[in-house]
Each structure stands twice: as C-alpha cells, then as structure tokens.
C-alpha cells in the first residue's frame, strides 16, 4: 500500500459503478443526503433505472472517472471488477492522484490486493469496503475497510449516508477477509437453522411453534439470521430471496479457499458447503438460502422411508 496525498476538498459528486440491488440502495441514500451521483452499468436497463432515480449517467467507466474523484463499485465478482478497472475504457484510464476507488463487492483478498496495485499505479487510492448487512438494513450497514486510512477519512461522509460506520481493519484485502469470515459464519448458521426446522417435522414439534417460541425468547441461540431463515421457512418465502443459495455458494467458496491458502482449512463450513451445493444441484440456486430446509427435509423423509421399509 502506497501513501496517498490526494485532494481533501469536500465531496459533492460520487461515481457509482454497478446499479444492481445493493448499488441502488447506495444510490438512493447518497441522493437523499444531497450528493450528486454519476452512474454506470453495462446493462442498459440498470442505467435507465439509475437515471429514473435522478442520477446522471456515464457511457463508460473511464468517462465516469473524468466526472468525479470518488468512485464506488458494487459488482458481482472478480471478473467484472477486472473489466471495469482495467478493460477497454476502464476506470484506470481516467484515474489521477485525486481519486479514491471504493470496492464494496465481495471478492477474495488476493484479487483486492492485485486490483489495488493496478489502481495505485495512477496515484489514486483503493479501498476494499464490503458490506455487512441486508438491503433492507440500508443505513445500518457496517463497512470493514482495508486500505489507506487517510483515504477512508476523506470518503467517510459519503459512506455514512448508507452505513452506520466504516471501520479501518487493515491493509488491502483486510476488509474482504473479514467479510468472507462473516460469510462462512452465515453459511453455518443458515444451515443449522434450516436443519433444525426440518428435524421438527420428525420429532413431533410443529416448526411454526418452534420458530415462534425460540425467536421470541432470550435464548443465546437466537440471532437475526435465525429469525429471518426461520420466518422464511414457516412462510414458504423461498421465492423472495434476501440472499440466494448461489450467492452464498460463491461467497463461501471464496472464504473456504482463503482459509485453505492460509493453512487453516475449515472443517464445519467446508461440510456445510456440500449441502449448499446439493441445494444448487436440486434446482434451488436462485431461491433464498432458507431453501436448505428442503434439502434436509428430503433427506430425513428418505431416511424415514428406508426405516419403515426395514
């Protein structure tokens, strides 16, 4: 990580690359707090959606970089980041020492460090700033941030339009490392919540009664995720995903590889990933992560059928 000596002039205009679900949440919050936004997305419908919300639009990332010095990215993964940063008419073509590029995507730390190195060749600063929080919790998000702390201080007023805090956690890649650890926890809590709800069906406990009783208690096992997953299972809310099985597989895969590369391979999260992949194989990839309940439910139904046959 190099030192950054960019401008500390007040920020009035923000660039946004990626106008999907999370990007739109950021766009709305920024504009509500008085920031102008210049948006870019490779999909015309997403660009039009941003324009309909009141944003200016850019035809290419390089053009966007010429119109604002603070740029947020919200993209699906490493391939899209590489294209936006270093592809034809990419951001790098328009970056200067006054720019701060903020990546809110969930990617692996190695990708972040490589991207930061390429961006910082221009004198610009690069921050990995993934989001801890659901779209419905916009404004309450936590942003673990890796990179130059001075650059973070400059852009924090913009970040705090959609987050409760942005915390410096280390150098390049540290923000994403923390996010991936969180995603491994998410995967495991989602799985055990789904499994227990499936077991209810076989031990004489109505799963709705179980959910309402536990979620309404002060038991140490109760978490926000259990409340969401359990409620989705009780209400058959699989087709209105807060987070899909396929996205969880992607994030957990990155986290498992990070742990393996650090010679600390995960045992529990690694096992859970097998069930995530079974869910995908059974056609549940675009459903809410609570659809893991269906995997466990079918498993126990088969076991019961075999026991009755014996």
Language model region names:
Residues 1-73, 99, 104, 135, ...:
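NAD(P)+-binding Rossmann beta1-loop-alpha1 motif at the extreme N-terminus of oxidoreductases
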Residues 154, 174-300:
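Helical "substrate-binding/catalytic lid" subdomain
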Residues 61-126:
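Rossmann-fold NAD(P) dinucleotide-binding segment
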Residues 37, 57, 126-127, 166, ...:
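Hydrophobic beta-strand scaffold residues
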Residues 84, 107-184:
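Rossmann-fold dinucleotide-binding core
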């Amino acid at each position: 990580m190099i030192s950054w000596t960019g401008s500390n002039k007040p920020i009035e205009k923000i660039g946004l690359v990626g106008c999907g679900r999370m990007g739109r949440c950021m766009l709305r919050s920024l504009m509500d707090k008085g920031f102008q936004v210049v948006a870019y997305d490779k999909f015309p419908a997403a660009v039009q959606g941003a324009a309909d919300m009141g944003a200016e639009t850019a035809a290419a990332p390089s053009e966007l970089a010429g119109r604002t010095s603070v740029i947020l990215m919200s993209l699906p993964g490493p391939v899209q980041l590489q294209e936006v940063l270093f592809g034809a008419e990419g951001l790098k073509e328009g970056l200067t020492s006054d720019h701060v590029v903020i990546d809110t995507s969930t990617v692996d730390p190695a990708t972040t460090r490589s991207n930061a190195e390429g961006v910082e060749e221009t004198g610009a600063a690069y921050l990995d700033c993934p989001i801890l929080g659901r779209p419905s919790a916009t404004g309450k998000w936590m942003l673990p941030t890796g990179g130059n702390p001075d650059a973070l201080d400059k852009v924090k007023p913009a970040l705090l339009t959609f987050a409760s805090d942005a915390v410096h956690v280390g150098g390049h890649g540290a923000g994403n490392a923390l996010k991936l650890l969180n995603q491994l926890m998410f995967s495991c809590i989602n799985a055990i919540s789904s499994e227990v709800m499936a077991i209810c069906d076989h031990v004489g406990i109505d799963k709705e009664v179980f959910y309402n009783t536990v979620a309404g208690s002060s038991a140490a096992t109760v978490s926000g995720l259990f409340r969401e997953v359990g409620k989705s299972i009780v209400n058959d809310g699989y087709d209105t995903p807060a987070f899909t099985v396929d996205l969880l597989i992607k994030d957990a895969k990155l986290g498992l590889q990070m742990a393996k590369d650090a010679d600390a391979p995960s045992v529990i999260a690694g096992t859970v990933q097998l069930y995530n992949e079974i869910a995908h194989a059974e056609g549940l990839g675009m459903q809410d992560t609570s659809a893991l309940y269906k995997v466990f439910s079918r498993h126990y139904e088969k076991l019961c059928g075999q026991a009755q046959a014996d």
